[in-house]
């Protein structure tokens, strides 16, 4: 008899909202213009890579946990930046998805795009 492998629960992948699709397109256009950035489709999202390292995923048809969220990866997150992330109400630092390497940023309006881009830039800088 085979031992049953324990699986991590899959993150919820709701449909991306229409607003989020527009915001993702705008953010994606900006990220695609950065040096060494390549994109690949990934489970209803578009993954953004700096060279071979993935640093972000933006919704195309699906989102992670929330219809208005994007995810970015900073591994390891420097302590000062982690403290800043913990103070940011739009970033979920408790339930990082999927796994501890990813952070979820929730957008509520176009005013959030500037801050989302700042965090995406941090992820890009740390993906060297």
State each model region's role.
Residues 74-128:
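Short, structured beta-strand-loop surface elements
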Residues 15-54:
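N-terminal first-folded block
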Residues 41-96:
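Short, conserved beta-strand/beta-arch hydrophobic-aromatic motifs that form part
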Residues 1-15:
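Polybasic, lysine-enriched low-complexity intrinsically disordered terminal tails
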Residues 19-26, 58-75, 114-128:
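Short, Lys/Arg-enriched charge-dense amphipathic segments
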Residues 1-5, 21, 57-59, 96-98:
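Short amphipathic alpha-helical segments, especially helix-boundary/capping motifs
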Residues 10, 30-31, 95, 102:
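Generic signal for short, ordered secondary-structure residues
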Residues 14-18, 107-110:
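Charge-dense, low-complexity intrinsically disordered segments
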């Amino acid at each position: 008899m085979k031992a049953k492998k324990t699986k991590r629960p899959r993150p919820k992948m709701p449909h991306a909202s229409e607003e989020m699709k527009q915001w993702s397109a705008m953010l994606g256009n900006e990220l695609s213009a950065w040096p060494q950035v390549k994109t690949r489709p990934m489970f209803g999202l578009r993954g953004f890579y700096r060279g071979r390292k993935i640093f972000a995923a933006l919704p195309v048809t699906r989102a992670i946990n929330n219809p208005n969220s994007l995810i970015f990866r900073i591994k390891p997150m420097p302590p000062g930046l982690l403290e800043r992330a913990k103070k940011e109400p739009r970033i979920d630092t408790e339930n990082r998805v999927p796994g501890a390497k990813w952070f979820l940023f929730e957008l509520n309006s176009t005013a959030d795009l500037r801050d989302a881009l700042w965090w995406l830039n941090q992820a890009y800088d740390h993906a060297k």
